[in-house]
Amino acid sequence: MEVRYSQDSESGMLLKNGLKEGKEGKDSQGSISKTFLKDQQESFSPSGAVENCEKSRASSGDPDYCRRILVRDAKGSIREIILPKGLDLDRPKRTRTSFTAEQLYRLEMEFQRCQYVVGRERTELARQLNLSETQVKVWFQNRRTKQKKDQGKDSELRSVVSETAATCSVLRLLEQGRLLTPPGLPGLLPHCGSSSLGSALRGPSLGITANGGSSSSSRSSAGSSGTAGGSPPLPTVTSSGTVTGLQGSPPAHGLFSFPMPSLLGSVASRISSTPLGMAGSLAGNLQELSARYLCSSAFEPYSRTNGKEALDKKVLE
């Protein structure tokens, strides 16, 4: 049997087969490249990141209010960050409202008139100032908060200033000798009688002698008041600044931790030239001294300190 075939037909078949194979190879290569690009795009796209994060969250057991996102840092590496779902990253940041000088002046005037502007007044004010009602409402809220802070600072400053003024007045009177109770006024301190402050104020009552002499009337009145009240004999200050009659009292310090001999000596040296008018001037000055200076908050730190020291002594004993 004789078989004949044409060379043209064979070459045509080979060409067709080659084209078919090339087309199939091209299609397979294109499908591979498309698949690779799709995988890469999904791995780096936000939706793919969210899906991957949801899958990883479901597998890792993260709470519902958290979400994971993939970010690329400056070095090119990819990191995973956990953020709350309520955080809207796509929303632009709100710009801060800037008011003009005219708007601020008008708002301040309205605030001085009424601190709460609501309803039709707020609508009209916002329309006149070319602002929204929300901006006006927020401004008034911030202004009320600022006023409360300023009032708190002012009240604290006033209390500090009043305490400082009271302390300075007491120290000034103490320096002038007005807090040293004369024998003729034993009942000046009725409110502080049982406290250590009252005993400290009543303790340094004095009879004054100048140029080495002695006043028998002052000593006799001091002795009578001392025996009547059951208190120890009253101290006596000489012109040289020495104090007698303080055997029962602590020798080191007196009121406000001032050395009592030096304090009384300075007072005695100031009034040594006019010894006869001392009792009258002291009585007048003490009557001018009101009870708020003697029992004010300026004495509280010292009374608390004395009470604490006494308690510590009892504990040590």
Swiss-Prot record:
A Pfam family annotated for this UniProt entry: Homeodomain
Annotated region described as Disordered, given as residue ranges: 1-62, 203-248
InterPro entries: EMX-VAX-Noto_Homeobox_TFs, HD, Homeobox_CS, Homeodomain-like_sf, HTH_motif
GO molecular function annotation: DNA-binding transcription factor activity, RNA polymerase II-specific; RNA polymerase II cis-regulatory region sequence-specific DNA binding
Ranges of compositional bias, category Basic and acidic residues: 18-27
Subcellular location: Nucleus
DNA-binding residues: 92-151
Compositionally biased intervals (Polar residues): 236-247
PROSITE patterns: HOMEOBOX_1 (PS00027), HOMEOBOX_2 (PS50071)
CDD domains to which the protein is assigned, alphabetical: homeodomain
Main location: nucleus
GO biological process: brain development; central nervous system development; closure of optic fissure; negative regulation of intrinsic apoptotic signaling pathway by p53 class mediator; neuron differentiation; optic nerve development; regulation of retinal ganglion cell axon guidance; regulation of transcription by RNA polymerase II
PANTHER family: HOMEOBOX PROTEIN EMX-RELATED, VENTRAL ANTERIOR HOMEOBOX 1
Record function comment: Transcription factor that is required for closure of the choroid fissure and together with Vax2 is required for optic nerve differentiation and to limit retinal development to the optic cup.
Name of the protein this chain belongs to: Ventral anterior homeobox 1
Natural source organism: Danio rerio (Zebrafish)
This protein's encoding gene: vax1
